[in-house]
């Protein structure tokens, strides 16, 4: 990621000379090989350097936040708490920190990478970065910054809340945004659907709801939707729960046949009916 998608073999010893200056060993230069598309590498760097993207988990002022410096960083912890990592990088430098016991026993007072390795990583990274300018991550050709709907991920539309995001050109979803839906509801009770009579008469209000529906490509039992529904059930905002019941009976519909007239004789195999509601 730090090299824009190129893999570079690390070298710990560059050269060894004897007392007379004779070279005993010198690391051979190995040509970097591309393993990730540069556009994908940039998006990963953008996500992992975005402090707002990790607010829910780590908070605004965690050890991972280095202020104005563009630093991508990732933490990691093994399930048994034996290994604890924080690895961060810019386009100039990579710093990785491991924390653990030398006898490989589980750690008792370290909960995650952000509380174990991150404090050490932060100090080392700030010291190293003081020697480099803040060049950020270069935006490769084919990547563009666009306005994206905050809920659906579709291109921003209809004034819904949106934010700026880096994307690979041509990868944004197209077509109708089915997550934002304008539902026809009763004027006197917007928790219920307008019935067909009210819809025909135009006697309804349009109200926005967020409809979260997903198909599970892996199992017959839609585990994705089960998880979504569980999350929706905990939300206080009713916009995640579109109504399913009508507000009142549609039995009051008055329909009059205008054509053909009563007792008319029909001699054609096709008949056109006209109604007045």
Locations of the language-model features?
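A conserved catalytic-loop motif detector
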Residues: 1-75, 79
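Soluble, non-transmembrane domains of envelope/secretory-pathway proteins that act on or interact
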Residues: 17, 25, 29-32, 70-277
